[in-house]
């Protein structure tokens, strides 16, 4: 399985580029974030013509998530249990849920496409919402793996957190001043490791960014952030054979400000030897 995650920053504006990437790179599963359209406005036909099944969840011109797959998509889940909502200027348990999470099972692998709240500012209510959202996701992850420890599970997407100083090359992103690098955000990200997940790309690609702001020549100066991740359970991580960060997708006409992150997986190595092909020297 070749799995990719990409914050496409408006799928309708970049549908040709997104589909072309998926086909060219032989992507089996593509998790997309910031599709920026309602569910019914998603360009399903372009993906289907290229041989993909698609599920999407969008409410308006903001946020939105989707999963495209070569294989059938099963057990689709919109949002996760305990996921908080948000509405500016309001508090309480019944706030509207944003289009930030969609999960599905593909060939026995549970995949989530996630667009974590930005946080906006350290003194903004959106920052508290971000931390609450991450905590709810962590609890759901723990519950899922406690019920099925051998499940190949992947949390993929834009986490809006640079977990280490090496993941921050943007001079305007400063600890104590801006979001994405605050100790509480980094602790929330690290908590997924305690929940049983591993950043499956970092051991193979220890450095490099996945996002560069459109402003102030951030990309030519390579002043980016590493905020897009594939976090996998033990059963998922053990199957990872390779990884890629497609920096060139930030080039060209009307690029997204994010680039795709790819993991190559082979689940057959866990099968009985009798089921594996024999190779003779």
Regions found by a protein language model. Give the residues of each.
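Active-site beta-strand/loop signature of hydrolases that rely on acidic residues for catalysis
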Residues: 3-7, 18, 22-40, 111, ...
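Structured beta-strand-rich core segments of catalytic domains in phosphoester-bond hydrolases
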Residues: 35-38, 42-121
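Conserved beta strand-loop-helix elements of the APE1-like EEP
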Residues: 61-76, 218-238, 265
């Amino acid at each position: 399985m070749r799995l990719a995650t990409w914050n496409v920053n408006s799928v309708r504006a970049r549908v040709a580029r997104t589909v072309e990437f998926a086909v060219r790179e032989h992507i089996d599963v593509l998790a997309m974030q910031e599709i920026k359209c309602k569910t019914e406005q998603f360009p399903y036909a372009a993906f289907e013509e290229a041989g993909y099944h698609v599920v999407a969840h969008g409410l308006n011109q903001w946020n939105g998530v989707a999963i495209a797959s070569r294989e059938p998509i099963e057990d689709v889940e919109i949002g996760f249990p305990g996921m908080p909502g948000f509405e500016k200027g309001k508090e309480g348990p019944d706030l509207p849920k944003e289009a930030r999470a969609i999960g599905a099972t593909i060939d026995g692998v549970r995949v989530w496409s996630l667009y974590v709240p930005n946080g906006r500012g350290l003194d903004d209510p959106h920052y508290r919402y971000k931390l609450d959202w991450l905590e709810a996701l962590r609890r759901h992850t723990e519950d899922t793996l406690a019920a099925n420890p051998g499940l190949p599970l992947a949390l993929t997407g834009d986490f809006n957190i640079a977990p280490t100083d090496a993941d921050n090359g943007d001079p305007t992103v400063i600890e104590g001043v801006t979001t994405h690098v605050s100790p509480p955000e980094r602790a929330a990200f690290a908590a997924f490791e305690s929940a049983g997940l591993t950043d499956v790309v970092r051991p193979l690609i220890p450095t490099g960014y996945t996002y560069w702001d459109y402003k102030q020549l951030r990309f030519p100066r390579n002043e980016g952030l590493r905020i897009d991740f594939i976090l996998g359970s033990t059963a998922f991580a053990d199957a990872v054979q390779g990884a890629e960060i497609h920096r060139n997708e930030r080039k060209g006409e009307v690029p997204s400000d994010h680039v795709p992150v790819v993991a190559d997986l082979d689940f057959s190595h866990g099968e009985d030897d009798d089921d594996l092909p024999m190779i003779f020297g």
